[in-house]
Amino acid sequence: MALNIFLVLLFAAFLCLGTLVLVKAKLEPAVFGLCLAVLVAALALRAPMLSHQTYDYQDFLAPWVQFFRENGGFLAIRQPLGDYNVPYLYFLAAFSYLPIADLYLIKALSLVFDLLLAFTGGRLARRVFGGKYAYPAAFSILLLLPTVVLNGAYWGQCDSLYAALTLLALTDALDDHPARSVVWLGIAFSFKLQTIFLIPLWCVLWYAKRLKFRHLCLFPVSYFATILPALLLGKPLGDILSVYFKQAGQYHDRLTLNAPSLFALIPSGAEVDADLLAKLGIGAAFLLVIGLLLWLFFYRSRLTDQHILTAGLILAIGVPLLLPYMHDRYFFLADVLSVVWAVGAYRRAPIPVCVQIASFGGYHAYLLLRYAFPMAWGAWLMLAALVCVIVSLGLSLRKGTGQGNILPEL
Protein backbone atom coordinates (compact mmCIF):
# COMPACT_ATOMS: atom_id res chain seq x y z
CA MET A 1 0.00 0.00 0.00
CA ALA A 2 2.79 2.42 0.94
CA LEU A 3 4.53 1.74 -2.37
CA ASN A 4 1.35 2.36 -4.37
CA ILE A 5 0.78 5.66 -2.58
CA PHE A 6 4.39 6.63 -3.19
CA LEU A 7 4.14 5.88 -6.92
CA VAL A 8 0.92 7.87 -7.25
CA LEU A 9 2.55 10.80 -5.47
CA LEU A 10 5.67 10.44 -7.63
CA PHE A 11 3.70 10.50 -10.88
CA ALA A 12 1.62 13.44 -9.67
CA ALA A 13 4.76 15.32 -8.61
CA PHE A 14 6.41 14.61 -11.98
CA LEU A 15 3.42 16.02 -13.86
CA CYS A 16 2.98 19.00 -11.53
CA LEU A 17 6.66 19.90 -11.59
CA GLY A 18 6.75 19.50 -15.35
CA THR A 19 3.71 21.72 -15.73
CA LEU A 20 5.29 24.41 -13.55
CA VAL A 21 8.45 24.25 -15.66
CA LEU A 22 6.41 24.72 -18.83
CA VAL A 23 4.45 27.60 -17.30
CA LYS A 24 7.73 29.27 -16.39
CA ALA A 25 8.87 28.89 -20.01
CA LYS A 26 5.97 31.14 -21.15
CA LEU A 27 5.08 29.14 -24.23
CA GLU A 28 2.26 29.80 -26.64
CA PRO A 29 -0.94 27.89 -25.72
CA ALA A 30 -0.68 25.41 -28.60
CA VAL A 31 3.00 24.73 -27.92
CA PHE A 32 2.31 24.47 -24.20
CA GLY A 33 -0.35 21.85 -24.86
CA LEU A 34 1.98 19.85 -27.09
CA CYS A 35 4.74 19.90 -24.46
CA LEU A 36 2.23 18.83 -21.82
CA ALA A 37 1.32 15.85 -24.00
CA VAL A 38 5.03 15.02 -24.31
CA LEU A 39 5.32 15.21 -20.52
CA VAL A 40 2.51 12.68 -20.11
CA ALA A 41 4.06 10.43 -22.78
CA ALA A 42 7.44 10.64 -21.05
CA LEU A 43 5.88 9.49 -17.79
CA ALA A 44 3.96 6.71 -19.55
CA LEU A 45 7.22 5.45 -21.07
CA ARG A 46 9.01 5.43 -17.75
CA ALA A 47 6.32 4.00 -15.47
CA PRO A 48 6.57 0.33 -16.63
CA MET A 49 10.36 0.43 -16.28
CA LEU A 50 10.51 1.42 -12.63
CA SER A 51 10.28 -2.13 -11.27
CA HIS A 52 13.15 -3.44 -13.39
CA GLN A 53 16.34 -4.36 -11.54
CA THR A 54 19.71 -4.31 -13.29
CA TYR A 55 22.94 -5.91 -12.14
CA ASP A 56 24.23 -2.46 -11.17
CA TYR A 57 21.32 -2.08 -8.79
CA GLN A 58 21.55 -5.60 -7.38
CA ASP A 59 25.34 -5.63 -6.99
CA PHE A 60 26.00 -2.04 -5.92
CA LEU A 61 23.14 0.37 -5.24
CA ALA A 62 20.90 -1.96 -3.22
CA PRO A 63 23.76 -3.23 -0.99
CA TRP A 64 24.91 0.35 -0.42
CA VAL A 65 21.47 1.48 0.77
CA GLN A 66 21.26 -1.61 2.97
CA PHE A 67 24.69 -0.77 4.41
CA PHE A 68 23.43 2.68 5.37
CA ARG A 69 20.27 1.17 6.82
CA GLU A 70 22.25 -1.19 9.04
CA ASN A 71 24.97 1.27 10.09
CA GLY A 72 23.21 4.40 11.22
CA GLY A 73 22.22 6.10 7.97
CA PHE A 74 24.18 9.30 7.54
CA LEU A 75 26.63 8.23 10.24
CA ALA A 76 27.81 5.47 7.89
CA ILE A 77 29.01 8.07 5.37
CA ARG A 78 32.35 7.98 7.17
CA GLN A 79 32.85 4.35 6.18
CA PRO A 80 34.58 3.34 2.93
CA LEU A 81 31.77 2.39 0.58
CA GLY A 82 31.51 2.06 -3.18
CA ASP A 83 33.13 4.13 -5.90
CA TYR A 84 30.63 7.02 -6.05
CA ASN A 85 31.52 10.40 -4.63
CA VAL A 86 29.85 11.44 -1.39
CA PRO A 87 27.15 13.83 -2.77
CA TYR A 88 25.29 10.90 -4.34
CA LEU A 89 25.84 8.82 -1.21
CA TYR A 90 23.95 11.50 0.75
CA PHE A 91 20.85 10.58 -1.24
CA LEU A 92 21.36 6.85 -0.66
CA ALA A 93 21.83 7.47 3.06
CA ALA A 94 18.61 9.51 3.15
CA PHE A 95 16.75 6.71 1.35
CA SER A 96 17.77 4.28 4.09
CA TYR A 97 15.44 6.05 6.53
CA LEU A 98 12.34 5.69 4.36
CA PRO A 99 9.91 2.73 4.42
CA ILE A 100 9.82 2.55 0.62
CA ALA A 101 11.71 0.08 -1.57
CA ASP A 102 14.99 1.81 -2.38
CA LEU A 103 14.72 0.78 -6.05
CA TYR A 104 11.84 3.22 -6.51
CA LEU A 105 13.50 5.96 -4.47
CA ILE A 106 16.64 5.75 -6.58
CA LYS A 107 14.65 5.88 -9.79
CA ALA A 108 12.43 8.69 -8.47
CA LEU A 109 15.58 10.78 -8.02
CA SER A 110 16.57 10.05 -11.61
CA LEU A 111 13.11 11.02 -12.87
CA VAL A 112 13.32 14.39 -11.14
CA PHE A 113 16.64 15.11 -12.83
CA ASP A 114 15.36 13.86 -16.19
CA LEU A 115 12.85 16.68 -15.90
CA LEU A 116 15.52 19.16 -14.83
CA LEU A 117 17.67 18.02 -17.75
CA ALA A 118 14.86 18.73 -20.22
CA PHE A 119 14.29 22.12 -18.59
CA THR A 120 17.95 23.14 -18.70
CA GLY A 121 18.31 21.82 -22.25
CA GLY A 122 15.34 23.93 -23.29
CA ARG A 123 16.78 26.99 -21.57
CA LEU A 124 20.13 26.48 -23.26
CA ALA A 125 18.54 26.06 -26.69
CA ARG A 126 16.47 29.21 -26.25
CA ARG A 127 19.53 31.16 -25.08
CA VAL A 128 21.67 30.07 -28.01
CA PHE A 129 19.17 30.03 -30.86
CA GLY A 130 16.25 32.19 -29.75
CA GLY A 131 12.87 31.85 -31.40
CA LYS A 132 9.72 30.34 -29.96
CA TYR A 133 10.37 26.72 -30.88
CA ALA A 134 13.91 26.14 -29.58
CA TYR A 135 12.83 25.58 -25.99
CA PRO A 136 9.89 23.21 -26.62
CA ALA A 137 11.86 21.24 -29.22
CA ALA A 138 14.82 20.62 -26.91
CA PHE A 139 12.58 19.99 -23.90
CA SER A 140 10.44 17.44 -25.71
CA ILE A 141 13.23 15.56 -27.47
CA LEU A 142 15.34 15.28 -24.32
CA LEU A 143 12.43 13.90 -22.31
CA LEU A 144 11.83 11.21 -24.94
CA LEU A 145 15.45 10.51 -25.90
CA PRO A 146 15.98 6.72 -25.60
CA THR A 147 19.23 6.90 -23.64
CA VAL A 148 17.77 9.46 -21.23
CA VAL A 149 14.64 7.36 -20.67
CA LEU A 150 16.60 4.13 -20.18
CA ASN A 151 19.37 5.65 -18.07
CA GLY A 152 17.19 6.57 -15.12
CA ALA A 153 13.87 4.74 -15.34
CA TYR A 154 15.25 1.36 -16.50
CA TRP A 155 18.89 1.32 -15.45
CA GLY A 156 18.52 3.34 -12.24
CA GLN A 157 21.53 5.52 -13.03
CA CYS A 158 21.94 9.21 -12.28
CA ASP A 159 23.64 10.64 -15.36
CA SER A 160 20.83 13.13 -15.87
CA LEU A 161 21.85 14.66 -12.55
CA TYR A 162 25.35 15.77 -13.52
CA ALA A 163 24.31 16.47 -17.12
CA ALA A 164 21.49 18.78 -15.99
CA LEU A 165 23.86 20.67 -13.70
CA THR A 166 26.46 20.96 -16.47
CA LEU A 167 23.90 22.36 -18.92
CA LEU A 168 22.70 24.73 -16.21
CA ALA A 169 26.29 25.89 -15.72
CA LEU A 170 26.75 26.52 -19.44
CA THR A 171 23.44 28.37 -19.73
CA ASP A 172 24.30 30.64 -16.81
CA ALA A 173 27.71 31.37 -18.34
CA LEU A 174 26.09 32.46 -21.60
CA ASP A 175 23.44 34.39 -19.64
CA ASP A 176 26.16 36.50 -17.99
CA HIS A 177 26.02 34.79 -14.60
CA PRO A 178 29.66 33.62 -14.45
CA ALA A 179 29.93 33.04 -10.71
CA ARG A 180 26.76 30.97 -10.60
CA SER A 181 27.94 29.06 -13.66
CA VAL A 182 31.18 27.94 -12.04
CA VAL A 183 29.37 26.97 -8.84
CA TRP A 184 27.01 24.70 -10.80
CA LEU A 185 29.98 23.22 -12.64
CA GLY A 186 31.74 22.41 -9.38
CA ILE A 187 28.61 20.72 -8.03
CA ALA A 188 28.22 18.72 -11.25
CA PHE A 189 31.83 17.55 -10.96
CA SER A 190 31.25 16.50 -7.36
CA PHE A 191 28.58 14.08 -8.58
CA LYS A 192 30.28 12.66 -11.66
CA LEU A 193 33.84 12.59 -12.97
CA GLN A 194 32.59 12.68 -16.58
CA THR A 195 31.85 16.40 -16.11
CA ILE A 196 35.57 16.79 -16.82
CA PHE A 197 34.92 16.23 -20.53
CA LEU A 198 33.36 19.71 -20.72
CA ILE A 199 35.45 21.58 -18.15
CA PRO A 200 37.93 22.90 -20.80
CA LEU A 201 35.02 24.87 -22.25
CA TRP A 202 35.25 27.23 -19.27
CA CYS A 203 38.74 28.15 -20.46
CA VAL A 204 37.12 29.24 -23.73
CA LEU A 205 34.54 31.22 -21.77
CA TRP A 206 37.38 32.92 -19.90
CA TYR A 207 39.36 34.12 -22.87
CA ALA A 208 36.14 34.98 -24.70
CA LYS A 209 35.51 37.36 -21.76
CA ARG A 210 32.35 35.58 -20.63
CA LEU A 211 33.88 35.20 -17.18
CA LYS A 212 36.95 36.34 -15.26
CA PHE A 213 39.70 34.19 -13.88
CA ARG A 214 38.65 34.89 -10.31
CA HIS A 215 35.28 33.26 -11.02
CA LEU A 216 37.08 29.97 -11.67
CA CYS A 217 38.22 29.96 -8.04
CA LEU A 218 34.62 29.18 -7.11
CA PHE A 219 35.01 25.71 -8.64
CA PRO A 220 37.04 24.21 -5.77
CA VAL A 221 34.94 26.17 -3.26
CA SER A 222 31.68 24.67 -4.54
CA TYR A 223 33.23 21.21 -4.73
CA PHE A 224 34.45 21.52 -1.14
CA ALA A 225 30.98 22.64 -0.02
CA THR A 226 29.50 19.39 -1.35
CA ILE A 227 31.96 17.20 0.55
CA LEU A 228 31.89 19.25 3.77
CA PRO A 229 29.00 17.27 5.34
CA ALA A 230 30.96 14.04 4.82
CA LEU A 231 34.03 15.59 6.44
CA LEU A 232 31.95 16.73 9.41
CA LEU A 233 30.62 13.18 9.72
CA GLY A 234 34.19 11.93 10.02
CA LYS A 235 35.03 10.72 6.52
CA PRO A 236 38.76 11.19 5.78
CA LEU A 237 39.52 13.78 3.10
CA GLY A 238 41.88 11.34 1.43
CA ASP A 239 39.09 8.80 0.97
CA ILE A 240 36.91 11.42 -0.72
CA LEU A 241 39.59 12.78 -3.01
CA SER A 242 40.76 9.31 -4.03
CA VAL A 243 37.35 8.22 -5.37
CA TYR A 244 37.87 9.58 -8.87
CA PHE A 245 41.43 8.29 -9.03
CA LYS A 246 40.15 4.83 -8.15
CA GLN A 247 37.48 5.10 -10.85
CA ALA A 248 40.11 6.10 -13.41
CA GLY A 249 42.29 3.17 -12.37
CA GLN A 250 39.62 0.48 -12.73
CA TYR A 251 39.06 -1.90 -15.64
CA HIS A 252 42.48 -1.46 -17.25
CA ASP A 253 42.14 -4.95 -18.66
CA ARG A 254 39.77 -3.66 -21.38
CA LEU A 255 40.32 -0.65 -23.62
CA THR A 256 36.57 -0.11 -23.96
CA LEU A 257 33.65 -1.37 -21.89
CA ASN A 258 30.79 -1.36 -24.40
CA ALA A 259 31.54 2.25 -25.30
CA PRO A 260 31.57 3.31 -28.99
CA SER A 261 35.08 4.72 -28.68
CA LEU A 262 37.78 4.27 -31.32
CA PHE A 263 39.06 1.27 -29.37
CA ALA A 264 35.89 -0.57 -30.41
CA LEU A 265 37.44 -0.71 -33.89
CA ILE A 266 39.99 -3.24 -32.64
CA PRO A 267 38.78 -6.73 -33.62
CA SER A 268 37.78 -8.95 -30.73
CA GLY A 269 40.62 -11.24 -29.73
CA ALA A 270 43.27 -9.24 -31.57
CA GLU A 271 46.65 -9.19 -29.86
CA VAL A 272 47.63 -5.56 -29.27
CA ASP A 273 49.82 -3.59 -26.91
CA ALA A 274 46.99 -2.30 -24.71
CA ASP A 275 49.23 -0.05 -22.62
CA LEU A 276 50.68 1.64 -25.69
CA LEU A 277 47.27 2.12 -27.28
CA ALA A 278 45.90 3.54 -24.03
CA LYS A 279 48.73 6.08 -23.89
CA LEU A 280 48.15 7.01 -27.53
CA GLY A 281 44.44 7.50 -26.82
CA ILE A 282 45.12 9.71 -23.82
CA GLY A 283 47.61 11.71 -25.87
CA ALA A 284 45.14 12.09 -28.73
CA ALA A 285 42.41 13.32 -26.36
CA PHE A 286 44.85 15.81 -24.87
CA LEU A 287 45.82 17.07 -28.31
CA LEU A 288 42.16 17.43 -29.28
CA VAL A 289 41.48 19.59 -26.23
CA ILE A 290 44.60 21.72 -26.65
CA GLY A 291 44.03 22.07 -30.39
CA LEU A 292 40.44 23.18 -29.87
CA LEU A 293 41.44 25.70 -27.20
CA LEU A 294 44.17 27.18 -29.40
CA TRP A 295 41.90 27.26 -32.45
CA LEU A 296 39.18 29.14 -30.62
CA PHE A 297 41.71 31.45 -28.96
CA PHE A 298 42.49 33.02 -32.33
CA TYR A 299 38.77 33.75 -32.81
CA ARG A 300 38.10 34.74 -29.20
CA SER A 301 36.83 38.24 -30.03
CA ARG A 302 34.11 36.89 -32.32
CA LEU A 303 32.92 33.77 -30.54
CA THR A 304 29.13 33.54 -30.37
CA ASP A 305 26.95 31.38 -28.16
CA GLN A 306 26.61 28.93 -31.05
CA HIS A 307 30.38 28.65 -31.42
CA ILE A 308 30.73 27.90 -27.71
CA LEU A 309 27.95 25.30 -27.76
CA THR A 310 29.52 23.65 -30.81
CA ALA A 311 32.88 23.55 -29.05
CA GLY A 312 31.18 21.89 -26.09
CA LEU A 313 29.72 19.24 -28.36
CA ILE A 314 33.15 18.57 -29.88
CA LEU A 315 34.52 17.95 -26.39
CA ALA A 316 31.55 15.80 -25.35
CA ILE A 317 31.99 13.54 -28.38
CA GLY A 318 35.72 13.73 -28.98
CA VAL A 319 37.19 13.21 -25.52
CA PRO A 320 35.41 9.91 -24.67
CA LEU A 321 35.82 8.81 -28.30
CA LEU A 322 39.62 8.97 -27.94
CA LEU A 323 40.13 8.01 -24.30
CA PRO A 324 40.64 4.37 -23.25
CA TYR A 325 38.60 2.53 -20.62
CA MET A 326 35.36 4.34 -21.43
CA HIS A 327 32.06 2.81 -20.30
CA ASP A 328 28.73 2.48 -22.08
CA ARG A 329 27.19 5.59 -20.45
CA TYR A 330 30.12 7.97 -20.93
CA PHE A 331 28.64 9.57 -24.04
CA PHE A 332 25.63 10.85 -22.11
CA LEU A 333 26.73 14.49 -22.39
CA ALA A 334 27.20 13.97 -26.13
CA ASP A 335 23.67 12.53 -26.38
CA VAL A 336 22.22 15.58 -24.68
CA LEU A 337 24.32 18.35 -26.22
CA SER A 338 23.89 16.98 -29.75
CA VAL A 339 20.12 17.37 -29.37
CA VAL A 340 20.41 20.95 -28.13
CA TRP A 341 22.87 21.77 -30.92
CA ALA A 342 20.63 20.28 -33.61
CA VAL A 343 17.65 22.36 -32.51
CA GLY A 344 19.34 25.32 -34.21
CA ALA A 345 18.92 23.93 -37.74
CA TYR A 346 17.06 20.91 -39.12
CA ARG A 347 20.00 19.99 -41.37
CA ARG A 348 21.95 19.12 -38.21
CA ALA A 349 19.49 16.36 -37.30
CA PRO A 350 21.71 13.50 -38.58
CA ILE A 351 24.31 14.33 -35.91
CA PRO A 352 22.19 13.53 -32.82
CA VAL A 353 20.76 10.54 -34.68
CA CYS A 354 24.27 9.14 -35.23
CA VAL A 355 25.30 9.89 -31.65
CA GLN A 356 22.13 8.36 -30.24
CA ILE A 357 22.39 5.16 -32.28
CA ALA A 358 26.03 4.71 -31.31
CA SER A 359 25.39 5.42 -27.65
CA PHE A 360 22.29 3.21 -27.60
CA GLY A 361 24.43 0.30 -28.80
CA GLY A 362 26.32 0.38 -25.50
CA TYR A 363 23.09 0.46 -23.51
CA HIS A 364 21.72 -2.48 -25.47
CA ALA A 365 24.88 -4.50 -24.84
CA TYR A 366 24.70 -4.02 -21.08
CA LEU A 367 20.97 -4.15 -20.49
CA LEU A 368 20.21 -7.12 -22.77
CA LEU A 369 23.61 -8.83 -22.64
CA ARG A 370 23.91 -8.94 -26.41
CA TYR A 371 24.98 -6.55 -29.14
CA ALA A 372 22.40 -4.87 -31.35
CA PHE A 373 25.22 -4.30 -33.86
CA PRO A 374 29.03 -4.41 -33.74
CA MET A 375 30.38 -1.69 -31.45
CA ALA A 376 32.76 -0.74 -34.26
CA TRP A 377 29.76 0.60 -36.16
CA GLY A 378 29.00 2.85 -33.21
CA ALA A 379 32.60 4.08 -33.19
CA TRP A 380 32.36 4.98 -36.89
CA LEU A 381 29.11 6.84 -36.26
CA MET A 382 30.66 8.80 -33.39
CA LEU A 383 33.73 9.60 -35.47
CA ALA A 384 31.57 10.77 -38.38
CA ALA A 385 29.55 12.97 -36.02
CA LEU A 386 32.73 14.46 -34.55
CA VAL A 387 34.18 15.27 -37.97
CA CYS A 388 30.92 16.89 -39.10
CA VAL A 389 30.69 19.05 -35.98
CA ILE A 390 34.32 20.16 -36.32
CA VAL A 391 33.75 21.07 -39.97
CA SER A 392 30.59 22.93 -39.00
CA LEU A 393 32.50 24.95 -36.42
CA GLY A 394 35.25 25.74 -38.94
CA LEU A 395 32.79 26.95 -41.56
CA SER A 396 30.96 29.05 -38.98
CA LEU A 397 34.15 30.69 -37.75
CA ARG A 398 35.25 31.49 -41.31
CA LYS A 399 31.97 33.26 -42.01
CA GLY A 400 32.05 35.22 -38.74
CA THR A 401 33.42 38.70 -38.23
CA GLY A 402 35.13 40.23 -35.21
CA GLN A 403 37.17 43.17 -34.07
CA GLY A 404 40.73 42.90 -32.85
CA ASN A 405 42.00 40.43 -30.29
CA ILE A 406 41.75 41.54 -26.68
CA LEU A 407 43.21 39.53 -23.85
CA PRO A 408 40.70 38.38 -21.23
CA GLU A 409 40.62 40.16 -17.89
CA LEU A 410 41.85 38.59 -14.66
Predicted regions and their residues:
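Transmembrane helical bundles and short interhelical boundary loops of multi-pass, membrane-embedded
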Residues: 1-11, 20, 41, 49, ...
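Transmembrane signal-anchor helices characteristic of membrane glycosylation enzymes that use polyprenol
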Residues: 3-59, 144-146, 150, 221-235, ...
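Loop-to-helix entry region of an early transmembrane alpha helix in multi-pass inner-membrane enzymes
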Residues: 3-4, 86, 90, 100-119, ...
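Aromatic/glycine/proline-enriched transmembrane-helix motif characteristic
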Residues: 14, 20-25, 127, 248-322
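Membrane-embedded helix bundles of polyisoprenyl
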Residues: 42, 134-171, 182-194, 219, ...
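Extracytoplasmic catalytic/substrate-binding loops of multi-pass membrane glycan-assembly enzymes
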Residues: 50-64, 79-91, 252-262
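Specific aromatic-rich, kink-prone transmembrane helix
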Residues: 119-123, 161-178, 337-338
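Perimembrane helix-loop-helix junctions
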Residues: 197-221, 232, 333
